């Protein structure tokens, strides 16, 4: 079939729903992915979708196509991307597809493909799938796969509570799902904790009417900053559209960059872990590097690709990692996938064991001056050419 190949990205598929990403494309993807799985003797795949426009339609076409190739589908419905990652591990099913465009504009949708070791499909697998999408000669298998509908959210929220060990400190937190997919689960999770919680923008709405759910853009954090001050909260947390990232606001209503937050977490993690390696990306500040070295840690420098970071952490047995984009990974008492809600809870766990507020803790770190991330607008076609040239 013909389609705009610019939707095929380094780690996932994303484009405008209705023009670049259509239900017919989901059908083709399901046929190709299912047929590829048959060639490597994989029998089952987990499928979920976030709250974006078109998610239900894309999922239906995807699932129908997968089963028509003989693949069994465990369909978990409306979930965050981390819940799909969780479900795959609980079920022992490595391969999965999440219908999402993450933090892209509200008009977009797409697909994240997961494979070996429950991680994003690597370059070699994606190349096979991407090439096959437009290859009429690619063999499409036929069969009669089954569909099992599974509710996994309750078990996910239960596991969240079990994984967090709180101290005696009582805390107030403001949580902003940004009308994204975290809206469907975050209250259920926080009901299991003794926190005083204020929720804002907590109704699922794929048009994102209050602000875009991308915590890496400080303008999107203004409502949260104001709410933290208004409610005298200890912490503010915001998630992106599919909740694999978390943004942070301190008790003074100031946004904390992800690398600075990681610097706070390092000491706590490295003091109890025999593994002292921490993965950071090239955009992280010297504040984080200083803290890792002060804790006698080892720095593993990586690219800003969260999919690659997750694989590198697994392959090199790295205990903690992340980058400036707010993707953060724990592998001390967590499987290591990026989960914004879990990251926020780990920060609260840390705070619950100290009398210091977040601002005072930040003052103990070395300070360096830097510019905010600068992004230059260009077309997808030009963007990829520029990156290749560099």
Predicted regions and their residues:
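N-terminal small/polar loop signature for handling phosphorylated ligands or for N-terminal nucleophile
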Residues: 39, 44-109, 189-249
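Phosphate-binding and adjacent anionic-ligand microenvironments
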Residues: 273-390
């Amino acid at each position: 079939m013909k389609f705009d190949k610019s939707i095929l990205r380094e780690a996932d598929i994303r484009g405008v729903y209705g023009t670049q990403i259509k239900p017919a494309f989901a059908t083709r993807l399901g046929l190709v992915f299912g047929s590829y799985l048959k060639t490597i003797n994989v029998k089952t795949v987990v499928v979920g979708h976030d709250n974006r426009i078109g998610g239900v339609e894309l999922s239906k076409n995807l699932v129908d196509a997968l089963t028509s190739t003989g693949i069994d589908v465990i369909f978990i419905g409306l979930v965050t991307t981390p819940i799909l990652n969780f479900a795959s591990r609980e079920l022992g099913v490595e391969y999965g597809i999440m219908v999402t465009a993450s933090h892209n504009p509200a008009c977009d949708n797409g697909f994240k493909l997961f494979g070996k070791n429950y991680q994003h499909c690597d370059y070699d697998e994606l190349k096979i799938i991407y090439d096959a999408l437009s290859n009429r000669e690619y063999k499409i298998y036929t069969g009669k796969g089954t569909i099992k509908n599974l509710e996994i959210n309750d078990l996910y929220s239960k596991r969240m509570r079990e994984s967090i060990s709180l101290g005696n400190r009582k805390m107030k937190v403001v949580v902003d799902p940004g009308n994204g997919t975290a809206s469907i689960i975050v209250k259920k999770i926080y009901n299991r904790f003794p926190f005083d919680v204020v929720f804002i923008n907590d109704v699922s709405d794929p048009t994102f009417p209050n602000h875009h759910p991308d915590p890496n853009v400080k303008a999107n954090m203004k409502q949260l900053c104001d709410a933290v001050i208004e409610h005298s909260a200890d912490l503010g947390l915001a998630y992106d559209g599919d909740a694999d990232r978390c943004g942070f606001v301190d008790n003074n209503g100031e946004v904390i960059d992800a690398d600075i937050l990681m610097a706070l977490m390092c000491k706590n993690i490295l003091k109890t872990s025999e593994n002292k390696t921490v993965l950071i990306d090239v955009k992280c500040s010297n504040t984080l590097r200083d803290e890792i070295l002060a804790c006698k840690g080892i720095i593993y420098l990586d690219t800003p690709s969260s999919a690659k970071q997750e694989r590198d952490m697994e392959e090199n047995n790295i205990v903690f990692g992340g980058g400036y984009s707010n993707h953060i990974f724990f592998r001390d008492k967590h499987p290591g996938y990026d989960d914004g809600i879990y990251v926020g809870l780990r920060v609260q766990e840390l705070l619950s064991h100290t009398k210091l507020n977040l601002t005072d803790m930040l003052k103990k770190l070395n300070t360096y001056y830097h510019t905010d991330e600068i992004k230059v607008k260009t077309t997808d076609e030009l963007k990829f050419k520029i990156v290749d040239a560099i």
